[in-house]
Regions:
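Residue position within the beta-strands of beta-propeller blades
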Residues: 155-159, 212-213, 261-264
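Extracellular modular ligand-binding repeats in secreted and cell-surface proteins
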Residues: 293-332
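Hydrophobic/aromatic-rich core segments of domains that either
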Residues: 34-100
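Repeated scaffold domains used in trafficking and secretory/extracellular systems
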Residues: 136-151, 189-207, 240-257
Length: 332
């Protein structure tokens, strides 16, 4: 995942830390809009899609344009990634939208718009105009404010349920347009004063067949292959950290190559400048690491069953980082 290089932006160290390029995004996991746009441009191009980078001096910003099934759309990966960085949280308001929709959303928080847009670095077809709104409603990512994960033909997400204090964990198949709710729950994100924040602030993370998700109190996992989905609680912040009501688990996800979760009293996670060091920013939340290997490194493997000319064999591999094992079949 990538975090917006907010501290570098404030400290004037963007260029020194590769915040303007793909190295910052893919290696350092931190960049500004130009780094997001160049990385997205590369990925779209690798997928064989006509695309370009767009920029606006009005709002000092860069984003992308892509052509799908004969129509052009805008993608702004930067503005769909909240700052300060909140692991697990990812918006989809600027994903495959028309220019008018993007510009309207821009004016919600800015006094200037993107009508001075300049298109550069075009690859494939030449950009004309982006007016189609096909992907702005009725799609599985519309309204989702958390990361979405893909595995074996299915997309996994978490969304608001039937009320402001309920949530659904979804398993969606794009080819059939069928969504299955794997698990439903309730969660109330309380405030220190006794109220609560309406909405879903849970996050999910998919690793193998295990889908991890958070509630205000706990980190849990479910087996996505199970016919009877029952959550297993892994961490309870009330007992493990003695966290009081009003302090909740608001963020969970991958950040800088590790899995982290934040405990704080507000969903609006932030940092403030250190009073004694102007280049340092202090976290207004407690950060913890969830010990799970997110990048397996398999050893050479050990044959556990020799193959014959009539039957297959098996070979066992062990991750040198975490000790997890896997079994692969050896052809007969």
């Amino acid at each position: 995942t990538v975090a917006y290089a907010y501290e570098d932006y404030f400290n004037g160290t963007i260029a020194a830390n590769h915040g303007y390029d793909m190295y910052g995004a893919l290696v350092k996991h931190s960049c500004v809009c130009q780094g997001y746009a160049e990385t997205m441009f590369y990925l779209l191009r690798e997928a064989g899609l006509s695309c370009a980078i767009a920029s606006s001096e009005n709002i000092n910003h860069a984003w992308n344009i892509v052509k799908i099934r004969g129509n052009w759309y805008h993608i702004d990966a930067t503005w769909d990634d909240p700052v300060w960085d909140m692991p697990g949280r990812s918006y989809h308001d600027y994903f495959l939208v028309s220019f008018d929709t993007m510009n309207k959303n821009t004016l919600i928080n800015h006094t200037k718009d993107r009508t001075d847009m300049v298109v550069s670095a075009q690859w494939g077809d030449t950009y004309t105009t982006a007016v189609d709104t096909t992907y702005e409603s009725g799609k599985f990512w519309n309204g989702i404010e958390k990361a979405i994960f893909y595995k074996d033909g299915y997309w996994y997400s978490i969304s608001e349920g039937s009320s402001k204090t309920s949530f659904n964990i979804n398993k969606y198949q794009y080819s059939t347009n069928i969504n299955k709710v794997l698990y439903s729950g309730t969660a109330k994100w309380t405030t220190p004063s006794g109220g609560y924040y309406p909405g879903v602030y849970s996050s999910i993370y998919l690793r193998g067949d295990n889908l991890y998700f958070t509630t205000p109190d706990s980190l849990n996992k479910i087996d996505i292959t199970s016919t009877n989905v029952t959550p297993t609680e892994l961490i309870n912040i009330r007992t493990q950290y003695n966290s009081s009501t009003g302090n909740n688990l608001y963020a969970f996800g991958e950040q800088y190559g590790k899995l982290v979760y934040f405990i704080t009293d507000s969903p609006n996670i932030k940092k403030t400048k250190d009073s004694s060091n102007s280049s340092k920013y202090n976290k207004e939340y407690a950060e913890y690491t969830f010990e799970m290997c997110i990048s397996h490194k398999w050893d050479a493997g050990v044959v556990t069953k020799e193959p014959t000319y009539t039957s297959t064999g098996t070979k066992k591999y062990t991750c040198t980082n975490c000790g997890e094992t896997k079994i692969e079949t050896i052809a007969k």
